[in-house]
């Protein structure tokens, strides 16, 4: 009788271990453990800190600068984390990504290759702005004619007023310079 109990115990533990391994290896479980709740494709929480995202010095590039403001849209926010990512040129992969922190005046700046576009959409750069427990996701949309914001961005950022809210873009030769200001407050999580 003792042998049967040991055999049953062994079989039960083996079945539980096999079930555990099968569950742990499913992609949905792994995605649930590692996926950040970004509303945009391509986000990677393990992005390295860098501001030059270019893979080539030849070709079309974009320089994005801006200031991060508080909830009133008046006071610059220093030392906030800004993560950016976009589709790589001539690719449908999000290999262009970087992370930076705002300076003491709330300024940030990065340079990148001109992004590829998803089918049916304009080129865009995605942003995740974080400070303490506050997180905000948004996107900067642009093309050869100018830089634009989404309706969601306008709804969440209108405290900046027209002068700071709408991005500006200047292009010369193969370089486009975009100024894109942001604000952050505890009611902005999307």
Residue spans for each PLM region:
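Bacterial Sec-dependent signal peptides at the C-terminal "C-region" and cleavage site
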Residues: 26-34
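N-terminal secretory signal peptides and thylakoid transit peptides that target proteins
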Residues: 1-21
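Acidic, serine/threonine- and proline-rich intrinsically disordered appendage/tail regions
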Residues: 166-170
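Beta-strand-dominated extracellular/periplasmic modules and repeats
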Residues: 35-162, 174-179, 188-190
